[in-house]
C-alpha cells in the first residue's frame, strides 16, 4: 500500500485469539489440560461441552470435552509473540477473510513449560481473528451493515500484517 493510500481505518489489528485444547473426556485429564492452558495464557479457561453424542469417541451430549481461553487486546498480542515462533505458518492456514489458525503439537514447546511425566503431553489449537477498525458495524445489533469489499481483510493483507508485526515468515 502506498503512502497516499494509507488511512488509519485500514490499519489491521488482532481482535481476538482463541486457544483451545480438546481432550475428549472429562475428569483428571481435562483438569490437567485446564491447568496447562491457564499457565500458558495467564487467563482462566472455560470448559467446552460436546454438542452431540458420538459412540465412536465414547462421548455423550452435554459432557465436557475440552477447554478454551479467549484472549483480547494486549494479552492476545503477547501470546502470539510467544506462540508464532514455535510453529511454521503457511498461507493455506489463512481463510478468505484474513483469519488464520495453527496447531501446537506439544505444550512443552512453549518456553514456560517443561515436560512432567505426571501430566503428559497435550496439543492445542490457536485461532486468530484479524479485523480492521469499523468491523463492529457488521456485528452490532442495531443498524448493522455489511462491510464494503474494499475494507474487508484479504489473505494478502493478513499475511503482510502478521509478517511485519510479529517478524514471522509465512510460507507459500
From Swiss-Prot:
Pfam families linked: Ribosomal_L5, Ribosomal_L5_C
Gene Ontology MF terms: rRNA binding; structural constituent of ribosome; tRNA binding
Cellular component terms (Gene Ontology): ribonucleoprotein complex; ribosome
BP-aspect Gene Ontology terms: translation
Signal peptide: none
Lineage top rank: taxon: Archaea
Annotated keywords: Ribonucleoprotein, Ribosomal protein, RNA-binding, rRNA-binding, tRNA-binding
InterPro entries: Ribosomal_uL5, Ribosomal_uL5_arc, Ribosomal_uL5_C, Ribosomal_uL5_dom_sf, Ribosomal_uL5_N
Family: Belongs to the universal ribosomal protein uL5 family.
Main function: This is one of the proteins that bind and probably mediate the attachment of the 5S RNA into the large ribosomal subunit, where it forms part of the central protuberance. In the 70S ribosome it contacts protein S13 of the 30S subunit (bridge B1b), connecting the 2 subunits; this bridge is implicated in subunit movement. May contact the P site tRNA; the 5S rRNA and some of its associated proteins might help stabilize positioning of ribosome-bound tRNAs.
HAMAP family, A to Z: Ribosomal_uL5_A
Subunit record text: Part of the 50S ribosomal subunit; contacts the 5S rRNA and probably tRNA. Forms a bridge to the 30S subunit in the 70S ribosome.
Protein name: Large ribosomal subunit protein uL5
Species, as recorded: Haloferax mediterranei (strain ATCC 33500 / DSM 1411 / JCM 8866 / NBRC 14739 / NCIMB 2177 / R-4) (Halobacterium mediterranei)
The gene coding this protein: rpl5
Amino acid at each position: 500500500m502506498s503512502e497516499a493510500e494509507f488511512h488509519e481505518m485500514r490499519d489491521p489489528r488482532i481482535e481476538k485469539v482463541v486457544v483451545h485444547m480438546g481432550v475428549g473426556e472429562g475428569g483428571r485429564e481435562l483438569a490437567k489440560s485446564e491447568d496447562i492452558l491457564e499457565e500458558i495464557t495467564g487467563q482462566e479457561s472455560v470448559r467446552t461441552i460436546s454438542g452431540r453424542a458420538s459412540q465412536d469417541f465414547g462421548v455423550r451430549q452435554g459432557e465436557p470435552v475440552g477447554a478454551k481461553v479467549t484472549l483480547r487486546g494486549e494479552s492476545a498480542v503477547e501470546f502470539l509473540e510467544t506462540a508464532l515462533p514455535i510453529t511454521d505458518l503457511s498461507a493455506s492456514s489463512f481463510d478468505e477473510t484474513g483469519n488464520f489458525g495453527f496447531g501446537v503439537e506439544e505444550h512443552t514447546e512453549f518456553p514456560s513449560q517443561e515436560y512432567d511425566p505426571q501430566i503428559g503431553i497435550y496439543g492445542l489449537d490457536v485461532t486468530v481473528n484479524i479485523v480492521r477498525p469499523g468491523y463492529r458495524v457488521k456485528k452490532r445489533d442495531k443498524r448493522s451493515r455489511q462491510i464494503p469489499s474494499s475494507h474487508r481483510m484479504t489473505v494478502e493483507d493478513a499475511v503482510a500484517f502478521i509478517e511485519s508485526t510479529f517478524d514471522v515468515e509465512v510460507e507459500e
